[in-house]
Amino acid sequence: MQTEHWGSLPAEDDGGQLTPDKYVPTAAKKLKLDEIRQRGDPQPQEKHHKLELRSALVTQTIEVMKQTEVLQSLIETYSNKNGSSNYLLNPCLMIPEVDFPPENAAELVGSQKFQKPIWFTPTVDTAYSRGDPEAYPEIPSSACRQAMRKVMCGMLRLAGFTDCSESAVQLLTDATEEFLRSFIGEYRGYYDSQPRLQNSTVLQLVPLERAHFAQTGTSLTQVHNYYKHKVLARNRAEIAEFNSVLQEYDKLMKESQSSMQKQHNEFNGHDFLNILDNSATGSSQSIGGMAMGDMLQDLGGSTGSSGTVSSQQMLYGLLDGQISSNTSNMTGTSGNGSTGGNGNGNGATISNFHATFET
């Protein structure tokens, strides 16, 4: 009897031939490995989903409010308000141009719900139309708090607040979080009491109304009224104010451009060159006078230290050329000695110098 051992390899004759669909050829493996090397390291799968928190209507309202403030500050800087009109403070100063995106002031919500007649559109068979359940990404509590904080800041700005302390924002965020937690608890309580609604993925109006009344004592229609009268009406009012301020600024800018063009047309280049020539002549004369005055002051200071010689007579003599005929009478000595008179440190004879200029 033949003994079979556990883990023994079968002989070559025992197994059949491998078909091409049972193995991968070596050449194909090499091509696949080269392709993987070219791709680089495999990227890890993104398990976190980024949810953009954006309310187009509130965001547009805040952006339009900022643009209106910028235009009003420019108008106050370059113009002076007199009654109901604005006048330029300096006609020669060009007002800067502003370029705001036109979509910032676009009307996102029309006055009519349907602008065109309703026509029949055949449905497309999709998971959404069939009502198949969808796997929604799980949002952590930290992301929810951050989202509520951003929403609270936007609603405060929409309400008219420009500055708010950190503690006030935190207090309002905590109050909103507690309200939503209680509201969802009331809503889930109604679903738990109805067996047929436990697996429902669609929001029902009756549970929402009961949960809202349990928390606030008012109907759920107050949310619609708030959106209509506070959010939507504020958006339209801010857009209307921005358009009015923009027209006023455009009027001032056109007035500034026309004033600059008028000043340019009235400007005469020949007169400007004459002004430059006159200013250059006056400056050269003043420079020459200052240089002559400095020279005379230096000369006057040196003669005043000589003792008995009068500074005015010496200057007049220098200017008239009298000093050239009398230079032969002046003698100099080196060191501390002198010839025929009291010597000074420079070696010049004061007696001869004195006799030359006195008459």
Curated annotation (Swiss-Prot):
The lineage of its organism: Eukaryota, Metazoa, Ecdysozoa, Arthropoda, Hexapoda. Keywords: Nucleus, Transcription, Transcription regulation. The keyword Transcription applies. This is SAGA complex subunit Spt7. GO terms for molecular function: protein heterodimerization activity; transcription coactivator activity. GO terms for cellular component: nucleus; SAGA complex. Component of the transcription regulatory complex SAGA, a multiprotein complex that activates transcription by remodeling chromatin and mediating histone acetylation and deubiquitination. The SAGA complex predominantly acetylates histone H3. Component of the Spt-Ada-Gcn5 acetyltransferase (SAGA) complex consisting of wda/Taf5L, Saf6, Taf9, Taf10b, Taf12, Ada1, Spt3, Spt7, Spt20, Sf3b3, Sf3b5, Nipped-A/Tra1, a histone acetyltransferase (HAT) module made up of Gcn5, Ada2b (Isoform B), Ada3 and Sgf29, and a deubiquitinase (DUB) module made up of not/nonstop, Sgf11 and e(y)2 tethered to SAGA by Atxn7. Interacts with Ada2b; the interaction is direct. It is found in: Nucleus. InterPro entries: Histone-fold, SUPT7L.
